[in-house]
Curated annotation (Swiss-Prot):
It comes from Acidothermus cellulolyticus (strain ATCC 43068 / DSM 8971 / 11B). This is 3-methyl-2-oxobutanoate hydroxymethyltransferase. Its EC number is 2.1.2.11. Catalyzes the reversible reaction in which hydroxymethyl group from 5,10-methylenetetrahydrofolate is transferred onto alpha-ketoisovalerate to form ketopantoate. The keyword Nucleotide-binding does not apply.
């Protein structure tokens, strides 16, 4: 049997769209390195998003606006090399696609060719519909992102729920425009649960919720939030499934104490 026969079949955008029709929900996590990519795959995570949230969680920026293409390419390469089954999606950073559809295509091509990802994601509604169309027509799947869009945090007046009251119509129009442009899925961030449910029922493509209630076709979290590595407080929508911050703190503290007291390395850990 060839080695290729042992490689698991990769999740595709068509698989995700089929799951919507079958009412089968799925999970996406952010991921920034090879080790966690392998762990998340083994745990059954279907989509790995190499998010621009790496700016905060990995690279120490105060927000997502400062990270650039070259920095994210390194992280995308690591995840794409490790992931054999999960669909890997590259989050395009601020300033790398907004100028024109041509710029969006050029950046998307860089991530597909140089990092080996299977799809790209960028933020915005109707204003980026032509960008989506151009990239999709070139053969690169695009995941859209509407509602609260972190790259527009200053224009939106800070981190707050989008689509309440009269603003709901604009969110609906954005979603329909992006679907028509060819997006294979849409992230709904900080959108009222009722509106997210309405959009999920109306759209033919999957919706991915983050702070958008329980009725989306899928859910996504930043993995450091999900695993309890991020300092508290975290947003209301975050459920902490572990307390890795305490685990790592205690492990590092114990290591330092063992070294200081001469307990490590002992005979069992020496050659």
């Amino acid at each position: 049997m060839s080695a290729a026969a042992d490689v698991p079949r990769r999740v595709t955008i068509h698989d995700l769209q089929l799951r919507k029709r079958q009412h089968r929900r799925w999970a996406m996590l952010t991921c920034y390195d090879a080790l966690t990519a392998r762990i998340f795959e083994e745990a059954g995570i279907d989509v790995l998003l190499v998010g621009d949230s790496a700016a905060n969680t990995v690279l120490g920026y105060p927000d997502t606006l400062g990270v650039d293409v070259d920095e994210l390419l390194i992280l995308n390469r690591a995840v794409a090399r490790a992931a054999q089954r999960a669909l890997v999606v590259a989050d395009l950073p601020f300033g790398s696609y907004q100028i024109s559809p041509r710029q969006a295509l050029q950046t998307a091509i860089r991530f597909v060719k140089r990092a080996g990802v299977q799809a790209v994601k960028f933020e915005g509604g109707r204003r980026v519909a032509e960008h989506v169309r151009t990239v999709v027509e070139a053969g690169i799947p695009v995941m859209a992102h509407i509602g609260f869009t972190p790259q527009s945090v200053h224009a939106l007046g800070g981190y707050r729920v989008q689509g309440r009251g009269d603003d709901a119509a604009a969110i609906r129009d954005d979603a329909l425009a992006l679907q028509e442009a060819g997006a294979f899925a849409i992230v709904l961030e900080l959108v009222p649960a009722g509106l997210a449910a309405e959009l999920t029922a109306a759209l033919q493509i999957p919706t991915i919720g983050i702070g958008a209630g329980p009725d989306c076709d899928a859910q996504v979290l930043v993995w450091t939030d999900m695993a309890g590595l991020t300092p508290q407080p975290t947003p209301k929508f975050v459920k902490r499934y572990a307390d890795l911050r305490t685990v790592l703190h205690d492990a590092a503290r114990a290591f330092a104490a063992d070294v200081a007291d001469g307990r490590y390395p002992d005979a069992a850990h020496s050659y």
